[in-house]
Amino acid sequence: MRGLILALGFLTRLPLPVLRDFQCAELVRAVVWFPAAGLVVGAAVALAAALGTVLDPWLGALAGVVMWAWITGGLHLDGLADTADALGAAHRDPARFLTVLADPHVGSFGVIVLVLQLAAKLVLLHWLLTLDLPWPALVLIPAWTRWAAAGWTLLLPPLKPGLGERFAWQGNRAGWGAGGLALAAVSAITPIAFVALIPAVLWGVWMWLKLGGQTGDILGAGIEWSESAALLLAGVSLALARGIIAG
């Protein structure tokens, strides 16, 4: 249970018991609980969207996006902004990329990408609400993206010292695999949730080929990218299945 509390405390801003005696190694082992934390995020987003949709789909979409940002504390959005700034200013220089990535200030690239990301989630979530996306799929998409993020830390080397480095060398691969199997079993009730794996794999391949590893900021950016892309793929899949888009 300590692992679940640590995972929720790290990935969400929910009011939880404070574990004052925890060691950093415990947080690393808590990576197996990242999918469970994702389920909590997804459930909160789905609930907010469902309540808002009672009045209007746009209000439901806005409520969902606000909840998404609030419950995660903007953690992954911060990583997305930092990664965008680094990519925009690095000019293919790996050393400069890491230098800009470590800068706590948000630049123009980061601001632009943040606005686009929030707008994309708002529009895509509204589209999915009008398509009657199965609620379990919305719950499962954040779980899959966080499971994927845990996998990136286990499979890719860290680009710099930090928490990402500890995850990489001390992570629990067996627990991560078991978490994936459990998520797959749950996702069988709404297979459209599996679309989240497509952008997650693509982001992992991109990190491997273009960057050669991962950092916490890049992992956060990957979660945001994977969530938005998964919403888009889910919408296209539903529209195709219902004949709204010609196949």
Curated annotation (Swiss-Prot):
| Positions in coiled-coil regions | none
| Cofactor names | Mg(2+)
Enzyme class comes to transferase
Entry keyword Transmembrane: yes
Q: Where in the cell is it found?
A: Cell inner membrane
Q: How does it sit in the membrane?
A: Multi-pass membrane protein
Keyword field: Cell inner membrane, Cell membrane, Cobalamin biosynthesis, Magnesium, Membrane, Transferase, Transmembrane, Transmembrane helix
Task: Look up the record and report any one GO term of the cellular component aspect.
Answer: plasma membrane
Where is the chain membrane-spanning?
A: 31-51, 57-77, 109-129, 136-156, 189-209, 218-238
Pfam families, per the entry: CobS
Instruction: Give the E.C. number(s).
Output: 2.7.8.26
| Role this protein plays | Joins adenosylcobinamide-GDP and alpha-ribazole to generate adenosylcobalamin (Ado-cobalamin). Also synthesizes adenosylcobalamin 5'-phosphate from adenosylcobinamide-GDP and alpha-ribazole 5'-phosphate.
Q: Which family is this sequence assigned to?
A: Belongs to the CobS family.
**Which HAMAP family does the UniProt record give?**
CobS
- The protein, known as: Adenosylcobinamide-GDP ribazoletransferase
Q: Which organism is it from?
A: Thiobacillus denitrificans (strain ATCC 25259 / T1)
- What gene is this protein a product of? cobS
